[in-house]
Amino acid sequence: MSFLSRQQPPPPRRAGAACTLRQKLIFSPCSDCEEEEEEEEEEGSGHSTGEDSAFQEPDSPLPPARSPTEPGPERRRSPGPAPGSPGELEEDLLLPGACPGADEAGGGAEGDSWEEEGFGSSSPVKSPAAPYFLGSSFSPVRCGGPGDASPRGCGARRAGEGRRSPRPDHPGTPPHKTFRKLRLFDTPHTPKSLLSKARGIDSSSVKLRGSSLFMDTEKSGKREFDVRQTPQVNINPFTPDSLLLHSSGQCRRRKRTYWNDSCGEDMEASDYELEDETRPAKRITITESNMKSRYTTEFHELEKIGSGEFGSVFKCVKRLDGCIYAIKRSKKPLAGSVDEQNALREVYAHAVLGQHSHVVRYFSAWAEDDHMLIQNEYCNGGSLADAISENYRIMSYFKEAELKDLLLQVGRGLRYIHSMSLVHMDIKPSNIFISRTSIPNAASEEGDEDDWASNKVMFKIGDLGHVTRISSPQVEEGDSRFLANEVLQENYTHLPKADIFALALTVVCAAGAEPLPRNGDQWHEIRQGRLPRIPQVLSQEFTELLKVMIHPDPERRPSAMALVKHSVLLSASRKSAEQLRIELNAEKFKNSLLQKELKKAQMAKAAAEERALFTDRMATRSTTQSNRTSRLIGKKMNRSVSLTIY
């Protein structure tokens, strides 16, 4: 007798009852089974893999099930038809502590297993013992008679009856779907049986691994809907993260284990679930970004300040902060067009470049009715092309000092763009904007109201629709008037030097040259290193610098870093306003020190004169006193004596 038998004697059994449970999985070509199999296939063939859960009774007084490798009661299988043919598959497990004579009542000392509706294989995890069911009137399988509802009775009766499809016992028994909703299944995971593997092979539809075994159609449909509704994210091609993503290829597939608080399950997420969560979503197009009109809700349009090939630019004031912005709106719908990529490229470049004093600042972008809108910094001076047109109308030109300042500031903007491994590829007067600001001088802070402020002109680079990477260029050719010859020949080895070439021609246009040709002999002469005719006299050093910038060999052209450090641009004749202000403050400080020293010297001189005068006075006074107190010794003195008698 085992230890369990000595401590706890087996409970009394009914007449003819056995201590073991025998359950059969009956597969018959009846209509009920076919209907149930069709329902299970509709739920998804991946739900019956058995990888995610296994049967286990909570708070069961029985010991846990032994693994197949551990020593234990031997397993016996009753003869039956082959798994491939319609018939019944019977698997018996010998319960520990089985009493003798069980073979007579139940057909042998065989173990128990749960019949799983719609699974095709029984779970090897241990089910409750026979005494647990002997006192109950419910069973997970239907019995033949209303009086005998125990698992033993069902097993004995089924041995002699024909094949029947498994069905719930009676209304009190929880149905299979409700049982699944209880989520009473835990590790260890149930391995696939031969029959379930065969069914998985025959399945026509393949689901993602890791799908929950007990996910019904409503939940799975809801989950797929949620996945489809997940906000998508664009990948910025100009960020370092995008390079790492493309270089690494697909994300590594790994498994993770997490705890499900709702049912106490230690579940293992599969590879494809993680891929669905971490895989970068496809690019958001203009059509998918439609929303309520943000332009009319958040901004008040003041006027139209410009237009071009891409669209129109409007001067707007934001209702929330009251600041003025430039809103760029595409003329025609961009969804699915070639201009859509240019619009997205401009947004990507603005987001990566961030804020720089010589690059137009970017704030936000969105889509409305298939149109792209970009919120940028408002430059009150307009574009350089507008200024050149105005100068041409009044026959006035930028002076050499102003041209040097223009070249220096735009060169600093290009240096910043090139330092981010990007190239602009469309430098021209219409893409350079002017911002005029009033900056208080230090003299105003000291109380000098004659020169209280100075106008500072800032040149900023805008329109980043042609920006591309230096390492992996996707060149979209810009204006042919400012296009370098090597770019036209599809030689992209020196793309930053193409921006230098275009900048030189931009300065030439600002100097008063005639409009540049789009093609022809004059176009080729410029690509050979000949400057267009300039209607004003420039210094030889500045002219030579412009010639070097349009040299036919791109390697001979200076880089943006070398350009901003050139001696011609940093000569003493042209100093910035900040440098002049610093020198002025230094001279004022020196002047104040000299004034203080002068006052000290004057005070010292006055004190010395006062001390000298005081010394003279003291000397004169001492001489006078000495003369009055002196006596003549050895001489006769006449004294008068008066006597008054009363």
Swiss-Prot record:
<dbReference type="GO" id="GO:0000086">
    <property type="term" value="P:G2/M transition of mitotic cell cycle"/>
</dbReference>
<dbReference type="GO" id="GO:0045740">
    <property type="term" value="P:positive regulation of DNA replication"/>
</dbReference>
<feature type="modified residue" description="Phosphoserine">
    <location>
        <position position="139"/>
    </location>
</feature>
<feature type="binding site">
    <location>
        <position position="328"/>
    </location>
    <ligand>
        <name>ATP</name>
    </ligand>
</feature>
<feature type="compositionally biased region" description="Basic and acidic residues">
    <location>
        <begin position="158"/>
        <end position="170"/>
    </location>
</feature>
<feature type="binding site">
    <location>
        <position position="463"/>
    </location>
    <ligand>
        <name>Mg(2+) 1</name>
    </ligand>
</feature>
<feature type="modified residue" description="Phosphoserine; by BRSK1 and BRSK2">
    <location>
        <position position="642"/>
    </location>
</feature>
<feature type="region of interest" description="Disordered">
    <location>
        <begin position="1"/>
        <end position="181"/>
    </location>
</feature>
<dbReference type="InterPro" id="IPR008271">
    <property type="entry name" value="Ser/Thr_kinase_AS"/>
</dbReference>
<dbReference type="GO" id="GO:0005654">
    <property type="term" value="C:nucleoplasm"/>
</dbReference>
<keyword id="KW-0832">Ubl conjugation</keyword>
<feature type="modified residue" description="Phosphoserine">
    <location>
        <position position="165"/>
    </location>
</feature>
<feature type="modified residue" description="Phosphoserine">
    <location>
        <position position="127"/>
    </location>
</feature>
<dbReference type="GO" id="GO:0004715">
    <property type="term" value="F:non-membrane spanning protein tyrosine kinase activity"/>
</dbReference>
<dbReference type="GO" id="GO:0000226">
    <property type="term" value="P:microtubule cytoskeleton organization"/>
</dbReference>
<comment type="similarity">
    <text>Belongs to the protein kinase superfamily. Ser/Thr protein kinase family. WEE1 subfamily.</text>
</comment>
<keyword id="KW-0131">Cell cycle</keyword>
<feature type="modified residue" description="Phosphoserine">
    <location>
        <position position="85"/>
    </location>
</feature>
<feature type="modified residue" description="Phosphothreonine">
    <location>
        <position position="190"/>
    </location>
</feature>
<dbReference type="GO" id="GO:2000134">
    <property type="term" value="P:negative regulation of G1/S transition of mitotic cell cycle"/>
</dbReference>
<protein>
    <recommendedName>
        <fullName>Wee1-like protein kinase</fullName>
        <ecNumber>2.7.10.2</ecNumber>
    </recommendedName>
</protein>
<dbReference type="InterPro" id="IPR017441">
    <property type="entry name" value="Protein_kinase_ATP_BS"/>
</dbReference>
<feature type="modified residue" description="Phosphothreonine">
    <location>
        <position position="239"/>
    </location>
</feature>
<dbReference type="InterPro" id="IPR017164">
    <property type="entry name" value="Wee1-like_protein_kinase"/>
</dbReference>
<dbReference type="GO" id="GO:0005634">
    <property type="term" value="C:nucleus"/>
</dbReference>
<feature type="binding site">
    <location>
        <position position="431"/>
    </location>
    <ligand>
        <name>Mg(2+) 1</name>
    </ligand>
</feature>
<keyword id="KW-0808">Transferase</keyword>
<feature type="modified residue" description="Phosphoserine">
    <location>
        <position position="312"/>
    </location>
</feature>
<comment type="function">
    <text>Acts as a negative regulator of entry into mitosis (G2 to M transition) by protecting the nucleus from cytoplasmically activated cyclin B1-complexed CDK1 before the onset of mitosis by mediating phosphorylation of CDK1 on 'Tyr-15'. Specifically phosphorylates and inactivates cyclin B1-complexed CDK1 reaching a maximum during G2 phase and a minimum as cells enter M phase. Phosphorylation of cyclin B1-CDK1 occurs exclusively on 'Tyr-15' and phosphorylation of monomeric CDK1 does not occur. Its activity increases during S and G2 phases and decreases at M phase when it is hyperphosphorylated.</text>
</comment>
<keyword id="KW-0067">ATP-binding</keyword>
<feature type="modified residue" description="Phosphoserine">
    <location>
        <position position="78"/>
    </location>
</feature>
<dbReference type="GO" id="GO:0004713">
    <property type="term" value="F:protein tyrosine kinase activity"/>
</dbReference>
<keyword id="KW-0597">Phosphoprotein</keyword>
<feature type="modified residue" description="Phosphothreonine">
    <location>
        <position position="187"/>
    </location>
</feature>
<dbReference type="GO" id="GO:0005737">
    <property type="term" value="C:cytoplasm"/>
</dbReference>
<feature type="compositionally biased region" description="Acidic residues">
    <location>
        <begin position="32"/>
        <end position="43"/>
    </location>
</feature>
<dbReference type="GO" id="GO:0048812">
    <property type="term" value="P:neuron projection morphogenesis"/>
</dbReference>
<dbReference type="GO" id="GO:0010972">
    <property type="term" value="P:negative regulation of G2/M transition of mitotic cell cycle"/>
</dbReference>
<feature type="active site" description="Proton acceptor">
    <location>
        <position position="426"/>
    </location>
</feature>
<feature type="modified residue" description="Phosphoserine">
    <location>
        <position position="150"/>
    </location>
</feature>
<feature type="modified residue" description="Phosphoserine">
    <location>
        <position position="270"/>
    </location>
</feature>
<feature type="binding site">
    <location>
        <begin position="305"/>
        <end position="313"/>
    </location>
    <ligand>
        <name>ATP</name>
    </ligand>
</feature>
